């Protein structure tokens, strides 16, 4: 039934369309880009209005080069592979095995071709030698241990670039030279080698650190054969710190929830620091992007983003983790089974950073070359300006790595170290130094072990074992990095 019109209500005519000059159509007003601040003739209109025609997008340039990388599950290599493949490089990566989170990450990366195997070979043992293990971590030539030339040759097939960080598994010097020879034969255009110093070459009074001296000799060989090369020297890894009983960088968890770091370094001598997992990759990538024109000719680059004394390192680490961290200058304690080659390295390191030296100015430069050390962190920041410092690492990453390694302190209640204030009690350099002096004197007077590796109950004369053994003691067994090369 039609609605009844009440005569007492006034009738209103339907509204007319009001025409406004230059008004937009309704459908245009509804579009999110229709109210552009640019005129229709503006060349920027196509950037601000999706209704206008725009040319097809140009494809992003993708690197067409392949990079050869060894020890791909190690900290330096894995960091580099992440960033290099993210921007389109292809990587040919050698790995000892495919076990662990990092190896899985690398091997499942679509831009990575994995070559699984050792860089060394072992001869079939004679009948009289069967059942005996060979320690493949010793410095220098090892009887029965050779170089896997077939794998090395295959690694460089089709590669134009190379990032090489050798380790002490096998004869590092022979392997390093074989890698350089293969790279030259393959026509590699830029060879970046992760080197370290031979301190004895800089000062005859300084001992060589065997595992570093091997790298130094490989560096000399790379220069000798004329590959376009750059050499990077990495500082102390932030992520070396662990509550697990590994030597040199063990942060020993105390009953009150604090930590003690004991090492032979002078408490007031500056040391270079680097977050290997976060910062090596971007820095190496920039070296390749800049090319040999800028970084070739055998240039050395110190990769370190902070110069901190042990006392300063403990201070910033304490701020990050929220608990007291104290430094004790003392001998390196070895409480787990370690490869013999690494044991020899630690003994030499104690001799180099002499516990009896009371003058921080007399401590040898970590990188051997004082000028290289003075370039920190300027040279590294020229490559990568977004580093993760030790404090940030301690706050954001250290608890996660500790939990992945089976530790639980981060989820347990912490009473603040018996009510002591962290800032007042442990961020004061003078109080830390008093603690260092007391501890050092105690060990000298009672233990009689100053300047020597503390055996920790491990028989150094025990039968040498192959590095493949699951009982090395230096392979983290947690989920986070079960396969990472120690200090690689």
From Swiss-Prot:
Source species, domain of life: Eukaryota
Matching InterPro entries: NAD(P)-bd_dom_sf (IPR036291), NmrA-like (IPR008030), NmrA-like_oxidored (IPR051164)
The entry's keywords: NAD, NADP, Nucleus, Repressor, Transcription, Transcription regulation
Feature: compositional bias, Polar residues: 36-45
Basic and acidic residues bias spans: 14-29
SUPFAM superfamilies: NAD(P)-binding Rossmann-fold domains
Cellular localization per UniProt: Nucleus
List of residues binding NADP(+): 71-76, 165, 215, 237-240
Region (Disordered), start-end ranges: 1-45, 422-488
Pfam families named among the record's database cross-references: NmrA (PF05368)
Protein family membership: Belongs to the NmrA-type oxidoreductase family.
Function: May be a redox sensor protein. Negative transcriptional regulator involved in the post-transcriptional modulation of the GATA-type transcription factor nit-2, forming part of a system controlling nitrogen metabolite repression.
Protein name: Nitrogen metabolite repression protein nmr
Upper classification of the organism: Eukaryota, Fungi, Dikarya, Ascomycota, Pezizomycotina
